[in-house]
Amino acid sequence: MSDDHGHAHDDPGTDDHHHHDRDHLGVAVLTVSSSRSLDEDPAGDQIADALESAGHGITTRDLVPDDYDKVQATVERFVDRDDTDAVVTTGGTGVTPDDVTVEAVEPLLAKELPGFGELFRRRSYEEIGTMVVATRATAGVADG
């Protein structure tokens, strides 16, 4: 049985399809919260610390309230930065009417990565159990 599934990278003469992977990324971190500030942002701090520990750089960091337009505009601004390869958001992913991060980000994605949400919920289940059903997560590629 062949592992060939019809993609160009199946040709042994083709470069590895992970050739674009990089060890060091420039990452923008956005916290979405109406009750926190950048000075008191444990989730954002934890994300930034984990990224830096993994060898990535934080290109910018910001905090915006739970507001669709502000979340979307800030993510768009981060995506447009030349020094930013990825944007990580935290907050605003619950099920209350104020939680709009997922709705604000998804229209910006050219390709969604549903496996991220699946993995996020699986790992969260280990920590919070069945409360995980009230969490939402999304990931994707902007700019195709």
What are these regions (language model features)?
Residues 1-144:
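Non-catalytic beta/alpha edge segments that cap or flank active sites
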